[in-house]
Design a protein with these regions (language model features):
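Helix-start (N-cap) detector for alpha-helical repeat units in TPR-like alpha-solenoids
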Residues: 25-26, 59-60, 93-94, 127-128, ...
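Ankyrin-repeat and related helical/solenoid repeat scaffolds used for protein-protein interactions
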Residues: 125-189, 193
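Non-membrane alpha-helical segments in proteins
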Residues: 26-37, 60-67, 71
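TPR/TPR-like alpha-solenoid helical repeat scaffolds
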Residues: 2, 169-173, 194-206
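Structural signature of tandem alpha-helical TPR/SEL1-like repeats
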Residues: 2-16, 38-50, 71-84, 105-118, ...
Length: 206
């Protein structure tokens, strides 16, 4: 197989593969990814749909379709495609993470926690899913669970600013104000915009 020299050549190459084998889901998927890189989203969506029509177990294509739905504000569409992703491949952590994220956006916190717990069970190193799960715990009043999960994130990535911010809030809720100050300052140092009311409340504990 000849190596493509640039994106346009790669697109042409994938179109040629599809012309010779229209039922190849992988070629449709590869073409779609290249089109995404060129911000040709409508064409990419068509190719992702062709990909899953040819290869219904192509979980990554469902995730990409969900991402396109999210891009235009269609949370229900994003949720549906990610559900198809996890049904097409058992233990697909990325799909479960996206399902959890959408449920959180829709205010379905229990459903978000259920999905995100699956995401981190299937992939214990899924940093963003851990961080989103910690936020869901916090929103649900599960302070200790939020603290434990945010600390896992910090163990994996010490400079993950969102988790330092969330730890500041969780420790405040728990009455552990010195720890709250420590993580608030770390979040600020990392460039995170901590809510002014949080910073103001913590001033008394400096």
């Amino acid at each position: 197989m000849a190596k493509a020299e640039n994106v346009e050549e790669y697109v042409a190459q994938q179109r040629a593969y599809i012309a010779s084998n229209p039922e190849c889901g992988t070629s449709h998927y590869n073409l779609a990814v290249a089109l995404m890189g060129q911000k040709r989203y409508e064409e990419a969506e068509k190719e992702f749909l062709e990909a899953v029509e040819c290869s219904p177990s192509l979980a990554e294509a469902y995730v990409q379709l969900g991402g396109l739905c999210l891009q235009r504000g269609d949370l229900d569409g994003c949720l549906e495609f990610n559900k198809r992703a996890v049904h097409s491949r058992a233990g697909f952590s990325e799909g479960w993470g996206n399902i959890g994220f959408v449920h959180l956006q829709k205010g379905n916190i229990d459903e978000a926690i259920h999905a995100l717990e699956k995401a981190v069970r299937y992939n214990p190193k899924f940093l963003q899913a851990h961080a989103t799960l910690a936020n869901a715990y916090l929103m649900n009043g599960m302070i200790e669970e939020s603290i434990d999960t945010n600390r896992k994130v910090i163990d994996m990535e010490p400079n993950f600013a969102v988790s330092h911010n969330n730890l500041a809030i969780a420790y405040m809720e728990n009455g552990e104000f010195q720890l709250a100050v420590e993580h608030c300052d770390k979040a600020v140092a990392l460039g995170y915009e901590v809510a002014p009311e949080i910073r103001k409340e913590l001033e008394a504990y400096r």
